[in-house]
Amino acid sequence: MTVEESVCETLRELKGTMTILLIEHESIRSMLPLNSLKSIAAYDIDPKGPKAGTFFGGKSELEPDANNLPIALDRILSDDQSRRKLLNLLKDVLPFANGLETEQMQDSSLFFNMREEFSRKPMPASFLSDGTIDLIALIVILYFERKSFVVIEEPERNLHPSLISRLVELFKDASRLKQIVVSTHNPEFVRYAEPGQLILISRDASGSSHAERPADKAQVQRFLSEEISMHELYVQNLLEA
């Protein structure tokens, strides 16, 4: 099965035309056991779940919707090296973040807080923005989960546009150790991605999904040679032409 076929199969529930950002590292292509379901994880982050807390006894592997993010963070924060790595990654995206901590309640529910440079008191997750929750979950997915093939649904959904370029850089960095597939409709992702990393997923009249790399098409190559960017072609809906 090719990478494109794997992407189509994993995203078969999606409807309509979508751009897929395939962020891959050449040295690991042959290492990915795409035929093993245990190596693949698909995430569609819902920030409402982590804000509400979770049962302390749940599994520490991050759920597809990141509902158990407090447990995943508790696991990471229990190790000094992992905690430092997490904080460095978080501060790189959110410079005002000074730390994360978890808090267990008497009813065995687990919450997490974030410390910010603006206040001495920790900020409960319930007060954090959806975008901040998403960023924390994305860092966990990219750097602390062990899946070798990761699909992430619209990770930019709650983020300010100014953060997308940095997010794409995080994806590229993390792709040294895992295959990352991002589904998106956002042209900003296309702007910061390499042309060869883009796969266009579309459906025909019968509902079948098809994948193609726009950068391989002669007409798109002509546009690119004339210094018309992939981002402009996507916004003008010319990648399928």
Where are these regions (language model features)?
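Short, well-ordered strand-loop elements centered on a beta-strand within folded domains, enriched
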Residues: 1-9, 16, 112-114, 206-215
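Conserved ABC ATPase signature
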Residues: 88-162
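Short alpha-helix of the ABC ATPase nucleotide-binding domain corresponding to the H-loop/switch region
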Residues: 160-165, 195
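Electropositive, glycine-dotted interaction segments
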Residues: 1-92, 101
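C-terminal lobe/lid and adjacent interdomain/linker elements of RecA-like ASCE P-loop ATPase modules
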Residues: 168-241
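Phosphate-binding glycine-rich loops of NTP-binding sites
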Residues: 5-6, 135-136, 186
